[in-house]
């Protein structure tokens, strides 16, 4: 099995990590030249809320729920006028509604108190908000403000291991390895491209490291399922 890189034919049976990185980068750019943001939003605040709601929930479900929420409140000033229970009743289909509704209400209060109602374009400041972890903050920094980050969730963690890009034991270590492997200007697009590819070709159950194009190109001799470290 061979692929073209820089005009040269390369034997995929002997891919180095650098060659795997180059091939994966090339292939994902070819498959997904455009990287639309999957969560519907109109500004940094609505994106922040949508990303928070997407924890353990599909983007499709979030996009079904947020119109009803944002019709009532699409800014911190309006959100704090709703009760936690009102928020909870709207977002219930997204799951974890008791925790998420409290976080949405409280972070809206803090944005008004500490940031004049604006979502801060600062990773550390975002991580201080209720319900906002490193991955959520990284997504907001990348998609709302265009700052180079490489948000890694369990799905990206799994694919990075299948593709031999990391031996990370968790998403923190995998994020570190991916940032080292790819140029900074590719981080934001790659985050989305890997997600798109994983959903379409390298699914959790549909590919065990021996099925999809990237897995078979990078590891044509792999005979056993690739076991991935869980986060």
What is each residue range found by the language model?
Residues 3, 9-230:
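Catalytic cores of DNA base-excision repair glycosylases
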């Amino acid at each position: 099995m061979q692929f073209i890189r820089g005009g040269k034919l390369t034997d995929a049976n002997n891919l180095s990590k650098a060659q795997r990185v180059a091939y994966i980068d090339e292939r994902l750019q070819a498959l997904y030249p455009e990287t639309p943001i999957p969560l519907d939003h109109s500004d940094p605040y609505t994106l922040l809320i949508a990303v928070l709601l997407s924890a353990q929930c599909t983007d499709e479900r979030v996009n079904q729920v947020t119109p009803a929420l944002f019709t009532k409140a699409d800014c911190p000033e309006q959100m704090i006028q709703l009760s936690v229970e009102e928020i909870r009743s709207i977002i219930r289909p997204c799951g974890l509604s008791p925790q998420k509704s409290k976080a949405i209400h409280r972070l809206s209060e803090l944005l008004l108190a500490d940031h004049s109602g604006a979502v801060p374009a600062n990773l550390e400041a975002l991580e201080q908000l209720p319900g906002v972890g490193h991955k959520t903050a990284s997504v907001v920094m990348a998609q709302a403000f265009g700052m180079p980050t490489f948000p890694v969730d369990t799905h990206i963690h799994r694919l990075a291991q299948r593709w031999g890009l990391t031996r990370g034991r968790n998403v923190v270590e995998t994020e570190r390895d991916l940032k080292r492997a790819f140029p900074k200007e590719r981080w934001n697009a790659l985050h989305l491209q890997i997600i798109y590819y994983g959903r379409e070709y390298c699914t959790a159950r549909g590919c065990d490291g021996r099925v999809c194009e990237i897995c078979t190109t990078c590891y044509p001799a792999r005979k056993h399922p690739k076991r991935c470290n869980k986060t």
